[in-house]
Amino acid sequence: MNKLISAKMIYALIGVVLVIAVFLVYKRQAGQAKVSEFGKYQGYSEAMYGGTKRVSDYLTLSNGTKLAYDFILPTQKDVPANKPLPVLFLYTPYLRTFIIFDEDGKDIISGLYRLKWYEKAYLRVRYWIYDRGNLMDPLFRKKWLGNMVKYGYAVVVVERPGTGASFGKLNPSFEVVAKETNEILNWIAAQKWCDGNIGMYGESWQGAIQLAAASTGNPHLKAIFPAASWIDNYSAIMYSGGVYNKAFSDFFTWSQKFLSSNVITPVDHDKDGIQLAQAREERRSAIVSEKIAEASRKIPFRDSLSPDGNKVWIDTMALYPFIDRINQYGIPVYMTTGWYDLCTRDNFLLYANLTVPKRLVVRPLDHEQVDETQFDLDYAAEAHRWFDYWLKGINNGIMDDPPIHYYLMGADKKYAWNVTDAWPPKNQESVRYYFGPGVTGETTSINNGTLDPSPPTAPEASDNYTVDYTTTSSNHSRWTAVNWTHDYPNMRSNDAKALTYTTPPLEKAAQVTGHPVIHVWLKSDVPDLDIFAYLEEVDGGGNSTYITEGNLRASHRSLGQAPYDNLGLPYHCHYKSDMAPIPAGEPVELAFDLLPTSYLFRKGNRIRVTITCADADNFETPVLNPAPKLHLLRDMNYPSSIQLPIVP
């Protein structure tokens, strides 16, 4: 009997072992199966490396300027790769590597990123355990890069002149950037560890730098991967609607001073920091990046001249003049932005004007988040697919995908990602909603107006408003979401101090995807004022959710012809010669677009447009005393309205 039990146990054990073996074989085969689709990638190459080696040194430009760089090579069992590899290159004004703790062990980095307590704890433990745990290097800052290195990519990060440990003076001109990147690309390609194929990556200014690089036609640059970049810095960031963006400017100024502090990392051989000290001394009197924001306040028009006679917003900071050259050389571009980014519109404009191989992804995120894996997308997979295709020649089908992927906010997650081969989507319809009279008994705002698809019939109708300079979209807006995420509050408290126009509860869900355009007719007792318009969703409890926004200074209302395809949106030249005060007692129309969005308004909820004359935490509106009065017109002759891009 015991022998029988023992035999059964042995057979059972053998069976379990066989099941486990079959499972492991199946799992391995499944893991090796080729999958290449949006946000998913496996089986097209093998992770051959398990470690990395980081080296930091100087390279020298033809003008003699020494630039600090980090070079990261994959290793296997501590042995660096012994063959040339494709290189991922970042050219940055934001430091290649950060020092996390000072000599006394004090945390000096978390203020820049607003780290949570557990993130700070992790950095502290890492500092105690690892050899270079005090450094926040490129792979630590961008997790997806580490995956690329495992699959046989090298990484090079170079600090721009006048930043970090680099010598020289920072020149923000993109013409200068193009020349510098061209030299660096040639230098990288000449190194024994590079196989001649280089791709660039990076977000924000680093993304814009890639576009300048693509305009050079350098034969070694095979593809770029910019996130949250722009083509027109004036209207996208610094002077949205002609109004000075103090929130971004103040943050940028503070962050650049921070990045010039003791977080800078010397190169490897500069053990005593002498070269770093020399680099900092060399640029002490230069107009470095921390002064750019200060200077920008003094050039309020697109054609304003700097002290040296330069039209900064056109000649220095704009990228639309480079589009023809980018198209001429045909370097492929994969753009990523977010619906809460500062530069959402500009990414659509860039896409519309490029004729090169291109891809555009729009995520439900802000400026700070779009170049990392988040809940919506495996960003690492997309980076891997893109660079494998263009740098390694792996035919993984990425260019067979629809060219535009966009996330429909408010939808169930399984239906959220949408695709299109054209922008705006071909099935989009522009539906005009007119501002209407107040609803009796409601006290949600100054006027409690309605939003109605039927045109007004009254010969005269208006809403009176005394400007309230305390209105704000919050101090955690998209305009400050650069190193930390946006966090809009319930907008009902702001609505209470504003003019609002709201639909009845929706009988069915409504998808708004595209660029809303607003037309505000007004009279005022002052020659100028600012108009801010917010698109919101109001639920059954009266809670109001921010969706998107637009703004315009009344004196900047003149319309002109854009120097590029601007998708038919209202274009304001913002030239000094175009400034037009509001004529006393006469109606004027302000037509402007709101930043694009894709949002599903739920059945039973309401669509709201909120109008204010200030965004206290974000934009610099002159405060007048007494506060001016505004008459927003909404009659048959002056029908204030909003055009919503509805997708059936």
Regions found by a protein language model. Name each.
Residues 370, 377-648:
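C-terminal, loop-rich substrate-recognition/catalytic regions characterized by aromatic stacking residues
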Residues 139-140, 150, 172-192:
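Alpha/beta-hydrolase active-site loop
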Residues 95-134, 138-145, 150, 215-328:
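Accessory cap/linker subdomain of secreted extracellular hydrolases
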Residues 81-93:
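Short beta-strand element of the alpha/beta-hydrolase
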Residues 145, 149-164:
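Conserved alpha/beta-hydrolase
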Residues 207-218, 350, 520:
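Short glycine-enriched nucleophile-adjacent loop
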Residues 192-205:
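Alpha/beta-hydrolase fold nucleophile elbow
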Residues 41-83, 502-508, 582:
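N-terminal cap/lid segment of alpha/beta-hydrolase-fold proteins
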